[in-house]
Amino acid sequence: TDLFSRFRLKYPAIHIRLETGDAAGAIERVQNGMADVTVAAWPNKLPVNLLFKTITTTPLVFIAPVVPSDVTSLTDRSDIPWKEVPMILAEQALSRKRANAWFAKRGIKPTIYAEVTGHEAILSMVRLGCGVGVVPKLVLDKSSLKEELRILDVKPALKPYSVGLCLHKNRLASPIVRAFWNIIEDTNND
């Protein structure tokens, strides 16, 4: 938000069209020319025609409901029986890839209760006691549901990821996009 505030202060005549949606498709939207700039998680491999500026890094966390349920009876154990725990995971986000890798490394085939689009859907379903989810801590911290969810102390922790802004290199030819990118660079240099 600070980036947008700085941009609006410096360039008040420029109108910003902001869309929210599934972060998993953010990089694809830039590649397809559907968006000039997107907020995205740093992918394991960034396509060579894209630029990425990290804004922050956030841990990925396992979350469970606070409300007593079958799920809490499993997650309250000192040794969580992961094969029995119903999981609510993103259909295709980086968080899903990291969760899959975490389970595979332990030889666990998780029980998938639901595959959803978007981290907010994971928060809602976990809150209801449907299962355990994996979300960026940043998403949990900003959620109105955070008091109804708890972070599980899981070792080893999932690999955190960087969140940043992504754009196609060709879009730097646009003065508006270039001005926004310069604000990002100025912020990173502060």
Regions found by a protein language model. Give the residues of each.
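Central regulatory/effector-binding core of bacterial HTH transcription factors
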Residues: 1-45, 116
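A late-sequence structural motif
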Residues: 2, 152-190
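Residues at or immediately flanking beta-strands
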Residues: 13-17, 109-113, 162-164
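Alpha-to-beta junction loops
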Residues: 14, 31-39, 60, 126-132, ...
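Alpha-helix/helix-capping structural signal
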Residues: 24, 43, 67, 94, ...
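Alpha-helical segments flanking ligand/cofactor-binding loops in enzyme cores
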Residues: 27-28, 53, 78-80, 123-124, ...
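Beta-alpha-beta core module
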Residues: 47-58, 72-74, 120, 124-169
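Secondary-structure junction motif
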Residues: 70-78, 84-106, 173-177, 181
